[in-house]
Amino acid sequence: MPTEIPDPRLTEVADNVFAYIQPDGTWFLNNTGFLRGERGVTVIDQCGTEARARRFQETVARTCEPPVQTLINTHHHADHTFGNFVAPPHATIVAHRKARDEVIATGTSIAAAFEGPDWGDIEIVPPFLCFEDRLTLFVDDLECQLIHFGTPAHTTND
């Protein structure tokens, strides 16, 4: 497995909506994104290692003047939540209640099962604003619906 972090690609897919694409190369690569508002940024998922999460956070900071206000975890898997700890301390971390429960129950145990990633000094920071069925949040005038459909898909909590 390569140990270097592949160069990610940042694409503005709509006005103030960005996709952060990490190319294949090792375990625990995921795609993230963020929504830029006038008063703050909403991040969708984090990265799975400390170095990748910090790199993503630096990209957000370079791209957006307002700070990260909200971090949404789409589900509990490590490639979406291990980097939560690099979010600004004032950021609200949002997810379905089951995602929070799984982040806490799983902790960093998955890291031992995979060779290759340099995890860094991961600190588990679970979501602390949770919803059961749906949650509406706004980034300026953009209405964002977080919906749990009640049936397992990729996980029980996405």
Please provide the spans of the model-predicted regions.
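Short Gly/Pro-enriched turn/cap motifs at secondary-structure boundaries
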Residues: 23-24, 119-122, 126-128, 148-152
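Core dinuclear metal-dependent hydrolase active-site scaffold
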Residues: 134-158
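Active-site HxH/HxHxD metal-binding segment of metal-dependent hydrolases
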Residues: 51-54, 58-130, 134-136
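Short acidic, Pro/Gly- and aromatic-enriched capping/linker segments at domain boundaries
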Residues: 2-10
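Active-site flanking residues adjacent to catalytic metal/cofactor-binding acidic residues
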Residues: 44, 74, 157
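Short Pro/Gly-enriched beta-strand edge/turn motifs at strand-loop
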Residues: 13-19, 115-119, 140-146
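Residue-level detector of beta-strand structural context in well-folded domains
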Residues: 8-9, 31-33, 129, 133-135, ...
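Conserved beta-strand hairpin/beta-sheet module of binuclear metal-dependent hydrolase folds
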Residues: 10-59
